[in-house]
Amino acid sequence: MFWSFNFYPAHSGGFFVKRIIHKKIGLYKLKYKCSSDYDFFWRLINKYKFKGTSTKKNELISNFKLGGFSSKYSFFQHVLEETHIRMDNGQNKIIVITIFLLRCLKNFYKL
């Protein structure tokens, strides 16, 4: 997702947030069934401009297996929910729709 305007998604397996940050930006929005973490990180980085730190390159901090919660949802459901998140957080609608269409086309031609 870096090509979508320099925004990296992250997984909660290696992400720690102080309580004061949750008080400032809010908790995870549970209305997003498969991308509430994406919304949280979007608000954290793009809306509130919080900065963080990262680990060394190629440092293992958690281990995920295939078939987790998010794999129950289709590619289209993920992209649609991320589109709603971007719109709900005030990103330019033309940019959001363009990204949505490009991601769908990219996935279609990949099949």
Language-model segments: which ranges?
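Membrane-proximal basic amphipathic "stem/tether" segments
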Residues: L80, M87-L111
